[in-house]
Amino acid sequence: MTSADGAASAAVSAPKVPFKPLPQKGPDVTVERRADGSILVRSNHAPGEGPRSIAHLLRDKALAHPDRPWMKQREPGHGPWRQVTYGEALRAAEGIAQSLLDRGLTGADSVMVLSSNSIEHALVMLGCYTAGVPVAPISPAYSLISSDHAKLRHCAAVVRPKVVFAQSGAMFERAFQTLSEVDTGLVFVTADGEGEGAIPLSDLLATAPTAAVEAARETLGHETVAKYLFTSGSTGMPKGVPQTFGMMSATIAGGEGLRAEEADPDVVPQSLEWMPWSHISAGNIGFNGVLWGGGTVHLDEGKPIPGMFETTIKNLYEVSPMVFGSAPIAFGMLAEAMERDPVLRASFFKNLRYMGYGGATLSNDVNERLQALAIAETGQRIPLTTMYGATETQGVTVTHWATEQVGLVGLPVPGVTIKLVPNGTKYEVRVKGPTVTTGYHNDPEKTAAAFDEEGFYRLGDAARFLNDNDPAQGMVFDGRVTEDFKLDSGTWVSVGTLRPDLVAACSPWVMDAVICGQDKPFIGALFWPSMAGMQTLAADAGPGTPLEKLTALLSGKLAAFNTTAGGSSRRIGRFVIMTEPPSIDAGEITDKGYVNQRATLERRDGLVQNIYANPPGAGVATV
């Protein structure tokens, strides 16, 4: 038995062990069932307090505790932490704001940020907020990976920046050249001062703020556009989504409406953040949440992919977070690491109050392993929360209570209304509320298509109540309306619910799975093996290669899975093991760590063809 098997077995007793208290109110909702079959769901908890703007929030926190560390980042090569305090952040933001105002920038302009998370990136963002100039953080892959810069050009055409910032002039030189061709009047700013014609960020930081900065800050309100975030672009060119201070404030207020206890002013929450600020989770919810809570965030240069997650583990030896949020794939890798390393386990659980995930469903197996580890270290289970939303909506539902159930999307955040609309055999999710954008920037056609006749935004996902007779138990993610497919028999396959169940059934040997079978006679699966599992099989002295051993193991586990599947919509006919890790460059896994089913199937079409070949192609196993 491997250590992972042991952890999962130990977790059988986990339901008898109490959860660590969650500092949030319990579920309380009103459900309205309409004559047309649609269902409206609202929280009975009122929203709490929220800031006027993030610029005002920064000023208030800097005045309250100017010397408290706000953000820390390691020097290159996993060196010592460097930091900026709340007071230093305010002074820097006001200097940058003054520099932008001196250059004539207004709310009709924008500043584009090309590079990944850094202290300098954060200061530029705060400077833009303070000046009332929208900031547009772009996925670094658009500049560094793309050969034609098509998405970079597109994003620039949408927001028409006047200033472009990047951490390194040399690293982003090619992107600068591309953008210069689009607009010869662009001003380039770099943190390292490098780059032909680029202005060092230090020049902006050294600008002395005048009364103009305070005047600009006082014009800010809930209607002010703070930034533009772009959708992932997995099904076309990214769409620019205006993010107002009102949307951000409503998200904070929703969380405050669920707070069950007053924050301890003597406790400074510590967090570790790897997810990119070019997306809603880290860029708005996480970034603003740290400011609101007066916490200290440590920037993590690791990612939940082989070869990079080791950096996250190194950081977790030193940073013991109060809350840890990430993509489901990261929790699987973290469980593997902690099962082998009691020192890491002790550091991770030292201050932890709860964990959170989003963007995909966490498997029951990973949850059980995490809880077994928590019990071994703390004697308690750790609540696992989820928040569900999109670039266009912020977080609109949350699981804010301790529950045995994995896969919930929770219940509406205070102030938000969820509408469930019948769509075939499922309910499509739509949302309205102060956290939702008014539309796409400079794209009225897509804006009109995104909202229904009542003004609800169409999320494109499906959800259902865990218990129709007791909606307070929460809603369950029921797949992407556009991701599900039909077999050639006409039977629907729900990818969003099948995938995590498959991963759990094949634990601890697989990291993730991709499902195929549209218009085919049976479902196929493509698996990524877990690193720990392959290491265990490589150390086994028995006959066969690790891949052959894994194929045999998965064949047995899938045969057992099929016996309880209940029908062709969940039975696996054939599978193949992918020996090449998911590629960020090719879009198979996003910079948030979420697997893109469509991109993976397109890139690995040869493997899909092998699954359905007669006879099966190389490497394909029949269950």
What do the predicted segments below correspond to?
Residues 82-87, 217-219, 226-253:
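Conserved AMP-binding A3 loop
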Residues 90-96, 206-212, 222, 241-263:
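Conserved structural elements of the adenylate-forming
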Residues 249-270, 277-343:
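Conserved AMP-binding/adenylation subdomain of ANL enzymes
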Residues 293-295, 313, 322-325, 335-406, ...:
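Gly/Ser/Thr-rich phosphate-binding loop
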Residues 427-487, 620:
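Conserved ATP-binding/catalytic segment of the ANL
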Residues 46, 67, 71-123, 143-153, ...:
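Conserved AMP-binding/adenylate-forming core of the ANL superfamily
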Residues 2-23, 130-203:
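Structural core segment of the AMP-binding/adenylate-forming
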Residues 66-69, 190, 196-230, 237, ...:
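Conserved pre-ATP/AMP-binding loop-to-beta segment of ANL
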